[in-house]
Amino acid sequence: MTTSSVATLGHSSELDGSRLSPHFTLGELCKTSAKTPDGNIPSHVHIENLKRLCGWLEVLRKRYNERYVMNRRDPSATLGMTKGVLSSRAKSRDLSRAALGRDDKEEPIVINSGYRSPAVNKAVGGVATSNHLTGCAADIRVTGMEQLIRYAAILLDYADETGEEFDELLLEKNRSGAFWLHFAVKPKGNRHKVLFISV
């Protein structure tokens, strides 16, 4: 995608097909429920930041699936089911995945919020210094505390192994009990900030 084509995009559906990495699209990282006149369209600089962030998200997706999805024990032993019952349930699951266009058994990483324009950031109550404004941050959906901790551990291990820097890894929980992982990587000046936060 060229810089000039980014400037002409005006709707999130037009962003959906633009790939930032093998498993993440520009549409995923720019989606918002906030209705603003600017359409939440990132600049070419923001897109480069999102690509850098997606490099980490690809590592997270790959390692999480290798460790916790693809190498699970035989579920029939754990669930006390006969293999026939489990097999019919697995077939049903596979058919529904196929209907969604998924040809693998891997679990996706789901992004709640990525890039935010100033108008979107204001509409959702984001802080003025948010890494979302520059395309350097993503809020990642998790199913609960266990997945939150596993995601955080994978990203911390990757940083330790490679020496790659990140800015923020925030394990967040709101008043209603929902968890998510806020993760940010800047082009430079990363702080390696790790916190548990209640919002």
Feature map (PLM): residue ranges:
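N-terminal cationic-hydrophobic initiation segments that often serve targeting/anchoring roles
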Residues: 61-65, 100, 156-160
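A cross-taxon signal for low-complexity, glycine/charged-rich
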Residues: 73, 79-84, 91-106
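Extracytoplasmic cell-surface/polysaccharide-interacting catalytic and binding patches
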Residues: 1-65, 192-199
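Short glycine-rich, low-complexity/disordered patches
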Residues: 64-72, 105-109, 164-173
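Catalytic cores and adjacent binding grooves of peptidoglycan-active enzymes
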Residues: 134, 142-199
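Extended, low-complexity, intrinsically disordered C-terminal regulatory tails
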Residues: 54, 58-67, 107-125
